[in-house]
């Protein structure tokens, strides 16, 4: 048995948790939309063709915001194709994912569906093949009440009330050579600045996300962020980060240490934002939108064999295992540790495509192992992020040194009078953890949720639910706080409630 210590103090404040860090992403890609959220012939389809069983699972996650419609798809998308009578909409080749897009689901259908699952939409505008004009028209179509061409067109389509979308993305991964309309940092920065300016003239209340690097391994990483922000700093509110992790080498200790890479990534981009703030003598602070993150590697080879140019092309259908859930938990913890700067995050994606939810055409929908840490954080991680002081045994691995076996984040809700400790034990031994609580003397343990499994590669399928959490965690109140026993390789959620 290993031992660790943790101090949780009410005054060790990181910042308020923006609920949007528990966001997700749905792209017109694979079976995310068609055969995912939308399947008119399914027994569970509602009057609009959207699957009610999928809606129920999304509601369990309490997803606050969903990025839409892409993704690489975005850079070749004409939003006008997806509005108006469905029978008049064109079928287009989506060059990003080699599919045929029917445009059955477009802006109004998706925004109406979002209301059904109680979420907001983070709408993205195409800065690949389109630009300023298409972007400002989309804002007018979505957000202007009436009396103009585009707002009245929306009303003529049967949607009288404006949507009031508050969060918008200025393109997608424009630094990537694979992107339709790929640009240099200066080219993108100028276009993004002018587009942002005009979009905010249409609706001054909106917030805008500029494209950061596609990932931290890009050769122009950091230089891209600095140049883009020098053009856009006074016109945007966030810059994006995208990152995915995998365990191709089947090296578990190294894989679980990847949360340290995310920590470094966040710090690097935040520092770059602050450098540009100083350079431009600005008084505003640009925060971060981690609007694509997840585990992604299981499906890579299988995707090469899928027939091109069909609709609902089954690609990126990663089947996640228990070790993936542990890393997703650690990545969520890392975001909470940076709640002062990370204000938006989107688990990419939500249904079928590298997703916590999987569906069968005409059949069931089910929860993958990564569903659970994401749900726990979203449901219980609302409030103020506190900085726990952790003394834990450490280990070295291929790419990292001094990796703590215990990774933890703490969220305090003054309104709900709850304290929630999220912790991952990365050790293959039980971890006895003494937790000192300062300022929470009247709090008692309400629940200790654990996600664990003897087989690190265990998966869930529609007929086999192997990886599910339980509430039989071992923790007890001690003289100065509590003692928690974290089982080997486990995700833990300890919920405490103030006693009257």
From Swiss-Prot:
Lineage: Bacteria, Bacillati, Bacillota, Bacilli, Bacillales
Gene Ontology CC annotations of this record: cytoplasm
SMART domains, per database record: Alpha-L-AF_C
MF terms in GO: alpha-L-arabinofuranosidase activity
Coiled coil: none
Pathway: Glycan metabolism; L-arabinan degradation
Description of how activity is regulated: At a concentration of 5 mM, K(+), Cu(2+) and Ni(2+) exhibit inhibitory effects on the activity. Additionally, the chemical reagent SDS also displays a certain degree of inhibition. Enzymatic activity is largely unaffected by product feedback inhibition.
Active site positions, chain numbering: 173, 292
Subcellular location: Cytoplasm
Protein task: Involved in the degradation of arabinan and is a key enzyme in the complete degradation of the plant cell wall. Catalyzes the cleavage of terminal alpha-(1->5)-arabinofuranosyl bonds in different hemicellulosic homopolysaccharides (branched and debranched arabinans). It acts preferentially on arabinotriose, arabinobiose and linear alpha-(1->5)-L-arabinan, and is much less effective on branched sugar beet arabinan.
The protein's name in its UniProt record: Intracellular exo-alpha-(1->5)-L-arabinofuranosidase 1
Catalytic activity: Hydrolysis of terminal non-reducing alpha-L-arabinofuranoside residues in alpha-L-arabinosides; (20S)-ginsenoside Rc + H2O = L-arabinofuranose + (20S)-ginsenoside Rd
Protein family according to the UniProt entry: Belongs to the glycosyl hydrolase 51 family.
Gene: abfA
Sites marked Important for substrate recognition: 296, 349
pH dependence comment: Optimum pH is 8. Optimum pH is 4.5 (at 30 degrees Celsius with pNP-Araf as substrate).
Keywords noted in UniProt: Carbohydrate metabolism, Cytoplasm, Glycosidase, Hydrolase
One Gene Ontology biological process: L-arabinose metabolic process
Oligomeric form and interacting partners: Homohexamer; trimer of dimers.
Positions contributing to alpha-L-arabinofuranose binding: 27, 72, 172, 244, 292, 349
Temperature-related activity annotation: Optimum temperature is 50 degrees Celsius. Optimum temperature is 35 degrees Celsius (at pH 4.5 with pNP-Araf as substrate).
């Amino acid at each position: 048995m290993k031992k660790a210590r943790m101090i949780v103090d009410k005054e060790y404040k990181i910042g308020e948790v923006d609920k949007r860090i528990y966001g997700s992403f749905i792209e017109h890609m694979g079976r995310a939309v068609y055969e995912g959220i939308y399947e008119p012939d399914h027994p569970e389809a509602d009057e609009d063709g959207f699957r009610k069983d999928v809606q129920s699972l999304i509601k369990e996650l309490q997803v606050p915001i969903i990025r839409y419609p892409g993704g690489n798809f975005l850079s070749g998308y004409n939003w006008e194709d997806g509005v108006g009578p469905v029978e008049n909409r064109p079928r287009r080749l989506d060059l990003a994912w080699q599919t045929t897009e029917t445009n059955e689901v477009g802006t109004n259908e998706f925004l109406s569906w979002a209301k059904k699952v109680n979420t907001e939409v983070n709408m993205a505008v195409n800065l690949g093949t389109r630009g300023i004009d298409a972007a400002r028209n989309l804002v007018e179509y979505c957000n202007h009440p009436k009396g103009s061409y585009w707002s009245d067109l929306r009303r003529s389509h049967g949607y009288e009330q404006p949507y009031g979308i508050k969060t918008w993305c200025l393109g997608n991964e424009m630094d990537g050579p694979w992107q339709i309309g790929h640009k240099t940092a200066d080219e993108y920065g100028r276009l993004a600045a002018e587009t942002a300016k005009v979009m905010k003239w249409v609706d001054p209340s909106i917030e805008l996300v500029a494209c950061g690097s596609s990932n931290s391994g890009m050769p122009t990483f950091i230089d891209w962020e600095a140049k883009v922000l020098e053009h856009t700093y006074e016109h945007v509110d966030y810059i994006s980060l995208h990152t995915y992790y995998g365990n191709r080498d089947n090296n578990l200790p190294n894989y679980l240490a990847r949360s340290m890479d995310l920590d470094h990534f966040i710090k690097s981009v935040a520092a770059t934002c602050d450098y540009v703030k100083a350079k431009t003598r600005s008084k505003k602070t640009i925060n971060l939108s981690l609007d694509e993150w997840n585990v992604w590697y299981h499906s890579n080879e299988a995707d090469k064999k899928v027939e091109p140019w069909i609709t609902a092309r089954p690609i990126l259908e990663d089947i996640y295992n228990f070790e993936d859930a542990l890393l997703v938990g650690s990545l969520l913890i890392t975001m909470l540790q940076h709640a002062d700067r990370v204000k938006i995050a989107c688990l990419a994606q939500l249904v079928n495509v590298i997703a916590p939810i999987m569906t069968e055409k005409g059949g069931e929908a089910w929860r993958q192992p990564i569903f659970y840490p994401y749900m726990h954080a979203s449901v219980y991680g609302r409030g103020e992020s506190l900085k726990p002081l952790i003394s834990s045994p450490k280990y070295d691995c291929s790419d990292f040194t001094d990796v703590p076996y215990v990774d933890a984040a703490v969220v305090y809700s003054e309104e709900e009078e709850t304290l929630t400790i999220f912790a991952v034990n990365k050790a293959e031994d039980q971890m006895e953890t003494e937790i000192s609580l300062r300022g929470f003397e009247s709090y008692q343990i309400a629940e200790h949720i654990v996600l664990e499994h003897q087989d690190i590669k265990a998966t869930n399928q529609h007929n086999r639910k192997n990886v599910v959490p339980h509430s039989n965690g071992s923790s007890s109140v001690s003289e100065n706080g509590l003692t928690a026993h974290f089982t080997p390789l486990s995700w833990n959620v300890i919920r405490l409630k103030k006693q009257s």
